[in-house]
């Protein structure tokens, strides 16, 4: 019940209307001049109206009935019945007309003329009414100004709702039951929105009002298919016998082109909206749900055989409050541009809606915006006022953000060209305005179209088949057509990862699996041949034609299982911290492989045999792939370069060992078969690290046995080990030399290896001649020194290490001190010039046993070779506890002992600066003075031991030392003002 209905039902209008009616008939009444609107409201005039000259007299025979009927009619809201003005129009054809009012049946007979002859609706677009409408005349003679309804802009919809009897179509609305606002009103039925004022609400295209539209009853077609419109009669019992003739619900008004196939004589075209009256006995038989305005469409009347369902025009329920929502949805979706291309739901939604929704039987326009088929995704659309836009001006400056309303105003004003780069604030890439218009399908107001939220993939504009560049969305059909190949799109290509190493990370993703698999295949001793690799590559790339896509649906499942298995196996790979290289892991997958024959085969470091590997899971050979990738270009990696250089260097350094080793039958190497990553092609490796390590171990074993059997060589080695660890010209603080290679070879730089190996060859030749020149004191000291036992693993690359330890770098000249007169004063013997230097670039980690052995041996070397007493060394150890963490005490003390044992400025500054550089809590100057004093005192009391060490005595007392050069210089003044000349003043001199 609306508000107007409550006003009409609760107020007693009979007294007011009766008094107004009397005053309106009196020409001298002041009401006419004071309230002209009420005059025109209560006294409508027309050509044949109530107050017209032809019908101003009311029949006295019915005046008694009018008093009782007037009160009931006014109470129900039908004001025209109280004024004896029948508000309903009859047909222009008198043969079809019926009794118009139950209150006054004598006014119009079946053969008489109606009160309103030839009623039409005025063609007035300003929402006012002409005299022919018999409602409100804006140019009435009694009104001194314009009608108030016209001034206030009252819409036709408001007049129709407030005064329902003024727009009724069928007969019999004089009854208070039918004329009251509580009943349904028969109105024109079109598929247009009630809010669209410019659209015609009537199918009559003549002089009908496009705003209101009043339809007339058509002429009977003479067919027995339709019910009789004039079935009611005044003689029927019940007080209101003709009520049923017009009690039809408004939604039962159907239109069909089959109503009048041959047209009608009254000028109304075929297919016009009809008002079909149901028979008397069938009015109350309709179910309540069929009368509900929420139930829309032709499915409302599936059981009513008397109402034909037309196909030319869809039913429109103007009484339903849902029409407002539907109209808003039409405006949002831009029905004018997109009516032919609605948003297509998914296949499952279409199938479900086609089976279960009543809207499936509707016409396309009705089913598109019906309540059952309303698109659910419209609820998440963002209105234009909340959309934020950015655009780039001609100077490529970003402007914004602006709302969609502002962008629309500027677009309609012509400021935006079609090539303007625009984007939403949430999007990443710009696109042209023309592209945006094509996407929304609305050129007039593209910025007013509600848009969906921007996702991570920027798929707000992307439907299936669009070519938006900022989209990562793959259409469903493309995914289905790809079949078993769609999972391979994210995999890295073979050319990208063929020579890439990822040693420090475990296999947690597909790319890491590819990298680790490639590293394993490189470090293994198997080399997969080209044919097998091509087969595995074709199998991995989903090698099948488009016709066989659905036959290989198990291919991605198989690959996923293999990937999971590979990830589990790769997770167990242990990485060595010392060498940063992988161990070849054993895969649990069953693999059939051919192994190396046990015959005599010489393995060259430049090339190795190729072993074909056949995967057990690959039972049938796949078809050749049309997308077969090009063979990757082989680039030598770091491991290959190192292994090649090591093999060449070792073969040159030890030719005799290589020759003796070649005579022995090699042990059959067990080949560990590997299944590489299915998408990566295994590249051939020239020399594997495992083979190099095994061959080096054999060579070192032979060398060890050969050296152990030769006592002369052992003596020379001991003599070399007895020399001072560091000389005056060597670099102190270098890392200690490795004694053993733990499990993997260290990554040595190839230029350093070449240089050291070349010098090692010369050093081996000099070892034989240098044995006889060794001092007996060194042999005795070396014999008394306990030798550290080498661990069992100290066999790998021992020869190379020993050569590096005892090698002499001849390319670097020793230091020569130039004395007075340009003479070299510290010329040493050739045996003394050959000093031992440790390589500074060798990186390794010693185990606990080796560290303890090297520490004890170095301490003993310091004690034995420096000539200092243990008391002095103990004081040095206690005093140097304040060194920073990470500073090696032995190396630092060895560096201090290599300095001249003299109390001069240079030695003092070097010691103090070294203390300041390696400690934050020690006093460098105090330690330098105390260290020099104690050292000189210790050496002067040990003359016998000092004479035994020739190199140390030359270092401290040689005339060619730095102290000898500095000693000849004149002594500089130590006063603070030594640079200035002091001038005494003359006392007796007078000033002028």
From Swiss-Prot:
The modification Phosphoserine is found at residues 175, 320, 509, 604, 637, 775, 829, 838, 840. It comes from the Eukaryota. The keyword Phosphoprotein applies. The modification Phosphothreonine is found at residue 318. Residues 386-434 form the GYF domain. It holds the Pfam family GYF. One of its GO terms (cellular component) is cytosol. Residues 193-205 have a biased composition (Low complexity). One of its GO terms (biological process) is endoplasmic reticulum to Golgi vesicle-mediated transport. It is found in: Cytoplasm. Has a role in mRNA export from the nucleus. PANTHER family: FI03272P-RELATED, GRB10 INTERACTING GYF PROTEIN. This is GYF domain-containing protein mpd2. It comes from Schizosaccharomyces pombe (strain 972 / ATCC 24843) (Fission yeast).
């Amino acid at each position: 019940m609306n508000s107007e209905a409550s006003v009409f039902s609760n107020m007693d209008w009979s007294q007011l209307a009766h008094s107004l009616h009397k005053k309106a008939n009196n020409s001298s009444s002041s009401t006419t001049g004071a309230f002209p609107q009420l005059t025109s409201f209560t006294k409508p005039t027309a050509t044949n109206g109530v107050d017209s000259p032809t019908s101003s007299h009311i029949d006295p025979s019915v005046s008694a009935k009018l008093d009782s009927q007037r009160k009931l009619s006014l109470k129900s809201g039908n004001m025209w019945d109280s004024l004896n003005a029948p508000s309903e129009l009859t047909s222009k054809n008198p043969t079809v007309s019926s009794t118009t009012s139950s209150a006054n049946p004598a006014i119009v007979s079946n053969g008489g003329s109606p009160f309103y002859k030839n009623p039409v609706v005025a063609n007035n677009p300003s929402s006012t009414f002409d005299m022919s409408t018999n409602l409100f005349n804006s140019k009435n003679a009694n009104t001194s100004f314009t009608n108030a309804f016209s001034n206030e802009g009252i819409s036709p919809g408001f007049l129709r709702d407030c005064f329902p009897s003024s727009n009724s179509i069928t007969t019999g609305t004089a009854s208070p039951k039918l004329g009251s606002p509580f009943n349904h009103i028969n109105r024109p039925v079109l598929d247009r929105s009630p809010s669209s004022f410019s659209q015609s609400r009537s199918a009559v295209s003549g002089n009908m009002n496009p705003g209101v539209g009043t339809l007339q009853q058509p002429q009977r077609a003479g067919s027995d298919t339709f019910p009789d419109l004039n079935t009611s009669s005044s003689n029927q019992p019940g007080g209101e016998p003709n009520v049923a003739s017009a009690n039809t619900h408004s939604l039962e008004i159907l239109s069909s082109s089959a109503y009048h196939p041959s047209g009608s004589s009254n000028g109304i075209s075929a297919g016009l909206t009809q008002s079909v009256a149901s028979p008397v006995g069938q009015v109350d038989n309709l179910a309540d749900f069929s009368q509900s305005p929420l139930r829309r469409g032709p499915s409302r009347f599936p059981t009513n055989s008397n109402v034909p369902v037309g196909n030319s025009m869809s039913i429109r329920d103007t009484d339903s409050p849902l029409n407002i929502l539907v109209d808003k949805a039409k405006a949002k979706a831009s029905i004018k541009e997109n009516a032919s291309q609605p948003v297509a739901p998914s296949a499952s939604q279409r199938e479900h809606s086609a089976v279960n929704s009543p809207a499936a039987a509707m016409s396309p326009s009705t089913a598109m915006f019906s309540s059952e088929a309303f698109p659910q995704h419209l609820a998440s659309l963002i209105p234009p006022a909340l959309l934020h836009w950015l655009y780039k001006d001609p100077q490529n400056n970003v402007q914004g953000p602006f709302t969609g309303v502002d962008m629309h105003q500027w677009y309609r004003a012509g400021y935006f060209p079609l090539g303007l780069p625009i984007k939403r604030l949430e999007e990443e890439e710009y696109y042209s305005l023309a592209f945006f218009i094509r996407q929304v399908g609305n050129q007039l107001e593209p910025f007013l179209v509600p848009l969906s939220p921007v996702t991570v993939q920027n798929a707000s504009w992307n439907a299936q088949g669009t070519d938006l560049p900022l989209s990562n969305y793959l259409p469903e059909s493309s995914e289905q057509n790809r079949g078993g190949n769609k999972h391979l799109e994210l995999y890295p290509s073979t050319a990208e990862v063929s020579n890439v190493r990822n040693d420090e990370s475990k296999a947690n993703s597909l790319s890491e699996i590819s990298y680790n698999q490639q590293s394993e295949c490189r470090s293994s001793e198997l080399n997969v041949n080209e044919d097998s690799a091509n087969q595995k590559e074709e199998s991995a790339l989903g090698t099948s034609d488009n016709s066989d896509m659905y036959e290989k649906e198990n291919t991605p499942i198989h690959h996923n299982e293999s990937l999971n298995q590979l990830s589990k196996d790769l997770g167990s790979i242990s990485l060595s911290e010392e060498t940063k290289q992988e161990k070849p892991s054993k895969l649990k997958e069953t693999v059939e492989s051919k192994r190396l024959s046990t015959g005599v085969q010489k393995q060259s470091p430049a090339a190795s045999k190729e072993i074909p590997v056949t995967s057990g899971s690959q039972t049938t050979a796949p078809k050749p792939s049309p997308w077969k990738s090009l063979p990757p270009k082989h680039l030598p990696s770091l491991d290959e370069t190192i292994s090649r250089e090591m093999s060449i260097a070792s073969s040159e350094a030890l030719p005799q060992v290589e020759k003796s080793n070649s005579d022995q039958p090699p042990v059959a190497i067990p080949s560990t078969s590997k299944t590489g990553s299915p998408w990566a092609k295994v590249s051939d490796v020239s020399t594997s690290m495992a083979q190099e390590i095994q061959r080096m171990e054999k060579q070192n074993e032979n060398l060890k046995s050969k050296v152990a059997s030769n006592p002369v060589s052992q003596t020379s080695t001991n003599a070399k080990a007895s020399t001072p660890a560091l000389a005056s010209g060597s670099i102190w603080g270098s890392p200690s030399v490795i004694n053993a290679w733990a499990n993997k070879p260290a990554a040595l730089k190839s230029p350093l290896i070449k240089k050291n190996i070349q010098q090692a060859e010369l050093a081996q030749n000099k070892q034989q001649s240098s044995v006889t020149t060794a001092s007996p004191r060194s042999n005795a000291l070396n014999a008394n020194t306990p030798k550290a036992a080498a661990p069992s693993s100290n066999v790998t690359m021992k020869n190379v290490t020993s050569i590096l330890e005892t090698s002499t770098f001849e390319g670097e000249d020793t230091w020569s001190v130039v004395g007075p007169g340009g003479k070299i004063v510290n010329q040493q013997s050739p045996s003394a010039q050959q000093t031992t230097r440790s390589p500074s670039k060798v990186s390794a980690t010693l185990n606990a046993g080796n560290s303890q052995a090297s520490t004890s041996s170095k301490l003993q070397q310091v004690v034995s070779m420096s000539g200092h007493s243990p008391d002095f060394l103990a004081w040095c150890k206690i005093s140097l506890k304040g060194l920073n963490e990470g500073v090696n005490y032995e190396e630092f003390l060895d560096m201090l002992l290599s300095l001249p044992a003299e109390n001069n400025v240079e030695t003092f500054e070097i010691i103090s600066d070294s203390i300041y550089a390696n400690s934050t809590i020690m006093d460098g100057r105090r330690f330098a003075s105390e260290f020099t004093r104690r050292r000189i005192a210790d050496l002067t009391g040990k003359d016998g031991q000092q004479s035994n060490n020739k190199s140390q005595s030359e270092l401290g007392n040689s005339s060619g030392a730095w102290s000898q050069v500095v000693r000849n210089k004149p002594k500089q003044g130590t006063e603070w003002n030594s640079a200035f000349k002091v001038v005494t003043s003359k006392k007796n001199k007078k000033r002028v």
